[in-house]
Curated annotation (Swiss-Prot):
Keyword annotations of the record: GTP-binding, Nucleotide-binding, Repeat, Ribosome biogenesis
Name of the protein: GTPase Der
Residues engaged in binding GTP 1: 9-16, 56-60, 119-122
UniProt organism field: Bacteroides fragilis (strain ATCC 25285 / DSM 2151 / CCUG 4856 / JCM 11019 / LMG 10263 / NCTC 9343 / Onslow / VPI 2553 / EN-2)
Gene Ontology biological process: ribosome biogenesis
């Protein structure tokens, strides 16, 4: 199960730069203007063999009397509840501010480890400013320069050392793990209740810490499966919380623990930006996907044409990955609820597919010979052999070629599309590798 690292602090202390450094991306916009990170940023990282998710809590709150304090207050409170490690970023060039003190007052009550990151120590002299931050009561300030990378390797060592040891609990690997995810009010709780009913038919429950995912094993409708949920759900009245950010953090937890994600879409609202954000999380984590268009009972004029138009719109927004099942359902009336579980089970089986090497070559090589990769720089590319890699999270295939460096992304997509035509790989991502023969 992955860990969650939250980056918190007042605006313009370098949170987005640190996020980019930890995730090795340029995903977060970096600007000197405070409040530049208007959207929530989340990414994946790995260090010393430990994978973890990173959330940059920068952002912007609309129609707030005090934009910065309101945003920081809500996101720090959520970080305190959700994160395994909290990075509190301060700016040594500005010293301790009132906002720093307000954030520190909250973090001193955190149950998770807090690392105070003294950023912008771009030269040795600036390190002499760091001791000022001891008065925040959060231990030693850890000096780094996010923009140059100085000190970030040691910071990563420290972050990983704070993670709890991985649970010794072992799940039955032959039983699929389903997570129901989606934006607020899409019907997640309703469909879970429809799945498991009032009796809940619990076989066994495996839980870790209060922030870990819970795997509850059910047997329902003839299916044996784990339903992935997260512990320690906070009551809505505990804080006037930012629901979008909170659901993203919660989705990270559920997605990481699942084999197949059941993404709930509200039929009365269609695809919105947060649906795309959660879909992106599913893709980043290489999980199986079933899209459920919930509240279908509320749609008027439910003709086949309307259903087809809705389906085409979903696939268009999720492109280029379009090979996944879509179920039009109603958690309230339990319409097609069994089909949701059936499709999730199929996607799980597709993720587990093992295709014999002889069959792969028998089906794919004639296609490749008929439609070879385009010649590059006058050189002809020949693919001689294909095999499936063992023990991978998703189906992964290696095509051996004489000039693998010249096989471009469009041809990889061609190979993937042809494989999806030949075998049922619906709902699961696949990996295509081109290697030297």
């Amino acid at each position: 199960m992955g860990n969650l690292v939250a980056i918190v602090g007042r605006p313009n202390v370098g949170k987005s730069t640190l996020f980019n450094r930890l995730t090795k991306t340029r995903q977060a916009i970096v600007n000197d203007e405070a409040g530049t990170t208007r959207d929530r940023q989340y990414g994946k990282s790995e260090w010393l063999g430990r994978e973890f998710s990173v959330v940059d809590t920068g952002g912007w709150v609309v129609n707030s009397d005090d934009i910065f304090e309101e945003e920081i207050r809500k996101q720090v409170l959520m970080a305190v509840d959700e994160a395994d490690v909290i990075l509190f970023v301060v700016d040594v060039t500005n010293g301790v501010t009132d906002l720093d003190m307000q954030v520190a007052a909250i973090l001193r009550r955190a149950k998770s480890p807090v690392i105070m990151v003294a950023n912008k120590t771009d030269n040795h002299e600036l390190r002499y400013n760091a001791p000022e931050f001891y008065r925040l009561g959060l231990g030693d300030p850890y000096c780094i320069s996010a923009i140059s990378g100085s000190g970030t390797g040691d910071l990563m060592d420290l972050i990983v050392s704070k993670f709890k040891k991985e649970s010794d609990e072992i799940l039955d690997e032959d039983i699929p793990r389903f997570a129901v995810v989606g934006r607020p009010n899409a019907g997640k709780s309703s469909i879970v209740n429809a799945f498991i009913g009032e009796e809940r038919n619990i076989v066994t429950e495996i839980a870790g810490t209060t922030r870990d995912s819970i795997y509850t094993r059910y047997n329902k409708f003839g299916f044996d499966f784990y339903l992935v949920d997260t512990a320690g759900i906070r009551k809505k009245n505990k804080v006037n919380e930012d629901l979008e950010y909170y659901s993203v953090v919660r989705s990270i937890r559920a997605i990481e623990g699942a084999d197949v994600c059941i993404l709930m879409v509200d039929a009365t609202r269609g695809i919105e930006s947060q649906d795309l954000n959660i879909f992106s999380l599913i893709q980043k984590n290489s999980k199986g996907l079933v899209v459920v268009v919930n509240k279908w009972d509320l749609v008027e004029n439910k003709t086949d044409k309307v259903m087809k138009t809705f389906e085409e719109a979903i696939r268009s927004r999720f492109a280029p990955f379009v090979d996944f099942p879509i179920v039009f359902a109603s958690a309230l009336t339990k319409q097609r609820i069994l089909k949701v579980l059936e499709e999730a089970r199929k996607v799980y089986e597709n993720r587990m597919i093992k295709i014999p090497t002889a069959r792969l070559n028998e089906e794919m090589l004639p296609l490749i010979e008929a439609y070879p990769p385009p010649a590059t720089k006058g050189k002809y590319i020949k693919i001689k052999y294909v095999t499936q890699l063992p023990n991978t999270q998703v189906p992964s295939f290696v095509f051996f070629a004489n000039l693998p460096q010249y096989v471009k992304e469009p041809y990889r997509r061609f190979l993937e599309n042809k494989m999806r035509e030949k075998w049922d790989l619906s709902g699961t991502p696949i990996n295509i590798y081109i290697r030297q023969k």
